[in-house]
UniProtKB/Swiss-Prot annotation:
It is a single-pass membrane protein. The keyword Transmembrane applies. The gene is COX7A2L. Keywords: Acetylation, Membrane, Mitochondrion, Mitochondrion inner membrane, Transit peptide, Transmembrane, Transmembrane helix. Interacts with the mitochondrial respiratory complexes III (CIII) and IV (CIV), promoting their association. This is Cytochrome c oxidase subunit 7A2-like, mitochondrial. SUPFAM superfamilies: Mitochondrial cytochrome c oxidase subunit VIIa. It comes from the Eukaryota. It is found in: Mitochondrion inner membrane. The modification N6-acetyllysine is found at K69. One of its GO terms (biological process) is mitochondrial respirasome assembly. Its main location: mitochondrion.
Length: 114
């Protein structure tokens, strides 16, 4: 048996399954058909041409070989000096922010004496 909250009696009342699963005051949508799609610009199907839209070369296989090389260097430092600078800057800002937050929490926890 299914139950539904009655807004009139403010109690649970027996109900059919279709009534119990639909919210009060809302009816299920009758039309399940999707409206036609309208495009602002004409679309091109992917099967129309086999030419790539970009002029660049696919670098993914080369980068996969480069990053999967077993040379003992972490992936986030593989590209040399720029990665080292970015890593060190990120770590410095993280440590500095943590220290700043701890100092702010300490100062906020101390009562002010008048």
């Amino acid at each position: 048996m299914y139950y539904k909250f009655s807004g009139f009696t403010q109690k649970l009342a027996g109900a059919w399954a279709s009534e119990a699963y639909s919210p009060q005051g809302l009816k299920p949508v009758v039309s399940t058909e999707a409206p036609p799609i309208i495009f602002a610009t004409p679309t091109k199907l992917t099967s129309d041409s086999t030419v790539y839209d970009y002029a660049g070369k696919n670098k993914v296989p080369e980068l996969q070989k480069f990053f999967q090389k077993a040379d003992g260097v972490p992936v986030y430092l593989k590209r040399g000096l720029p990665d080292q600078m970015l890593y060190r800057t990120t770590m410095a800002l993280t440590v500095g922010g943590t220290i700043y937050c701890l100092i702010a929490l300490y100062m906020a926890s101390q009562p002010k004496n008048k």
